[in-house]
Amino acid sequence: MNKIAELISRLCPDGVEFKTLDSLVSYVQPGPYIVSSTEYDAHYSTPVLTAGQSFILGYTNEEEGIYNASSQKPVIIFDDFTTSFHWVDFDFKVKSSALKILKIKDKQKADFRYIYMAMKTIHFIPTNHMRHWISLYSKFEIPLPPLNIQKEIVSFLDSFTSLIDKMKQEVEMRKKQMVYYIDKFYGGDFDGMMRLADIPGNSVVQFSDLGPIIRGKRFVRDDIRTVGQPCIHYGDMYTYYGTMAVTAKTFLERDFPKKMRYAHKGDVVIVGAGENDYDIGVGLVWMGEEPAAVHDACYILKHHQIPMYISYYLRSNIYHQQLKKYVSSGKISSFSAEGLGKVYIPIQPEDKQRQIASILDTFETYISKLEKMIELRQKQYEYYREKLLTFE
């Protein structure tokens, strides 16, 4: 950081010049690289990209029309409508024509990675559904210091991204380990789960045998407040909550929820509707001292087991393989309380349940700490990126 400041002071005493993006990069139309079939498979070799949030949509086995990018010849794929973009340094195909493939014009004048980072400081939000690169976005200016300063800035910022990437890789590795142990603890597969019943003290029962399965009551986003009666909305089960919650993200007015149905401390809340067949059915243990009103796209399970033992089971492949038989697929997938009640779960002695929950808690705590560290490093990266690339 000090080295960069010294270079800027010495080489740019009168400030830094600004250049338009179209003076620094050219674009290639994506037409020749559009995938013919959307029959993707993870076993295929060529990724199919979008410039949107999803980035990699899947993998194709098509051999023609592959764009050859590499660490030596990287590109930026730019969404012409949303203006989101991604750095790409591997071979790929694209999903649609609604993007541009950006390339560096002159490596002697500008570092392409620097341009990519500088583009991240352009805080433009599209308001019209139109193509933006040619008519507008390419005319935006970015600061362009001497090439050696660009490279120093890239090196400094990439040290953050490299650390963040390594931490993300560890999170993914730990999550895979956790999934492995979850399945192992509950039998490995359906037959293995059934064999657990042969162990003295164990049994395999259906969810309906655990206790009442109660559907929540309807409320909408407009009913939600920042204070009041705790409530659990089904959408937040996917985006906010984990396997357990002590406090709620949202609330209802105190006089609103007289007709609501509640999760009490130790109850398991299971989401019964979603946009895909796999995530549906995950759940959390409500551990708040105050009851939480539950949305009607969720179910409340009353039971007499170790709560986290059930919550972790809801993350197992064994559970989801059974549940999908009772899921009605459509624009929104869903299942009934009756369907959930038919799913089997291995019941082990209480001390064994506690032991399993404790081991999995250790994984989850470690993963949570890593994710918080990633968030902190990401904020540091964005702070330094803004500071360095605005030259203020």
Where are these regions (language model features)?
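Amphipathic alpha-helical coiled-coil/heptad-repeat segments
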Residues: 1-20, 144-201, 347-392
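Short, recurring structural edge motifs at helix starts
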Residues: 5-11, 33-38, 125-129, 139-146, ...
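Non-catalytic DNA-recognition/assembly elements of restriction-modification systems
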Residues: 8-32, 43-54, 196-217, 373
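Short, structured motif recognition centered on aromatic/hydrophobic residues
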Residues: 16-25, 94, 113-116, 154-160, ...
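Long compositionally biased, domain-poor regions of proteins
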Residues: 22, 89, 105, 110, ...
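DNA target-recognition patches
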Residues: 22-60, 73-80, 221-254, 264
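A short beta-sheet element
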Residues: 55-118, 233, 259-315
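A short glycine-rich beta-alpha junction/loop motif
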Residues: 93-100, 128-146, 291-297, 328-351
